[in-house]
Regions:
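Accessory RNA-recognition modules of RNA-modification enzymes
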Residues: 2-230
């Protein structure tokens, strides 16, 4: 079997700092590496044009590579300040809603073209129906416990009882949710740190992913918008 030709730009598992230049099919950001050998494209999901990111190559071929987002080092000039804690599940929350709609529409149309082979999709596509609520629209949220936390100051892992979400790109590390994420009930999320303290005071251990031991693993909350009850 002939050996597959590799590119001269990146290797699998290599960690790079990349400038996202454009937005591509499937909701992936496009970064490019330039050298004497030419230009090489790297696709990074959950990123925005203008961001400087740290990413790890997880797929490499002759013509392009795909990378997993590790961290956003510098924001895009399109991003705006929001009063919410950033979480992995909402990578576009700092974009104005008009730009969110633009990128999501472009991504949807490109899927119909590239996978569905529908060339005239623009003529067939009726405008999507926007949610009446830009924020706090979810009626269910699942939080995870972890015995390994993320230090936002040192940007390293540490032994800590955490309750929140998995750190982006790391299955075994938790990131405490200390305030409203903008997705679920504000009062509930502002008080999640008190629930975490209650669990700590119980003396029972949070889930330790690598060791697969621990008592607290998931915390699931549902909300009824009809009765405004959790």
């Amino acid at each position: 079997m002939p050996r597959r030709e590799r590119n001269k730009f990146v290797k699998k598992n290599q960690v790079l700092e990349l400038k996202i230049e454009d937005y591509a099919f499937g909701g992936k950001g496009i970064a490019r590496i330039h050298s004497e050998d030419g230009s090489f494209v790297i696709f990074v999901p959950n990123t925005l044009p203008g961001q400087l990111v740290k990413a790890q190559i997880n797929k490499s071929s002759k013509n392009y590579a795909e990378a997993k987002l590790i961290d956003v080092l510098a924001p895009s000039e399109d991003e705006v300040e929001v009063p919410y804690q950033d979480i992995p599940g909402a990578p576009y929350i700092q974009l104005p809603i008009e730009l969110q709609h633009k990128y999501k529409k472009e991504s949807t149309l490109s899927l119909f073209k590239k996978i569905g082979k529908v060339e005239n999709i623009e003529a067939l596509f009726d405008e999507f129906v926007s949610s009446p609520n830009v924020f706090h629209y979810r009626n269910k949220m699942e939080y995870g416990f972890s015995a390994i936390g993320y230090d936002r100051v040192t940007k390293r892992d540490k032994d800590e009882f955490t309750l929140g979400f998995k750190r982006r790109g790391v299955w075994w590390m938790g990131d405490n949710l200390d305030k409203d994420s903008g997705l679920f009930d504000k009062q509930m999320e502002d008080n999640l740190k008190n629930i975490r303290q209650y669990c700590i005071d119980s003396g029972l251990d949070p889930w330790h992913g690598p060791k697969r031991v621990g008592f607290f693993r998931y915390f699931v909350v549902r909300k009824s918008f009809k009765t405004n009850e959790l």
